[in-house]
Amino acid sequence: MAGFIIIGFGNIVNRDKIVAVVSPDAAPVKRMVQQGKEEKIVIDATQGRRTKAVLVTQEGFLVLSALQPDTIGKRLHAEKIIEEKGDLDE
């Protein structure tokens, strides 16, 4: 079952397609985002705000979010727990 998480400002992504959630402050991540912009594989979901997290998808897309990586990680974890509890109830 595909689950979605909110990554801020009404934007949602498929939880099952997220490979990593990283901080954009490290130099390698900055290079990855810059290269991704040149290759047109970056999806900017910040609504003009500062990028605080970069989500890497299975398909190689980079999704920029204005939420902290910790916040997104907690949402990913919470969704997984809810889904597992739902499976147990059936």
Give residue ranges: language-model regions.
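Short aromatic-glycine motifs in intrinsically disordered, low-complexity regions
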Residues: 1-12
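Short, charged/polar surface micro-motifs in flexible loops or helix N-caps
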Residues: 12, 24-29, 38, 59-61, ...
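Phosphoinositide-dependent membrane-docking surfaces
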Residues: 15-23
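Amphipathic alpha-helical interaction segments
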Residues: 25, 39-43, 79
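Compact, glycine-rich, soluble single-domain proteins
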Residues: 30-39, 44
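Short, structured protein-protein interaction patches enriched in aromatics and acidic/basic residues
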Residues: 44-58
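C-terminal structural segments of small proteins and small subunits
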Residues: 54-90
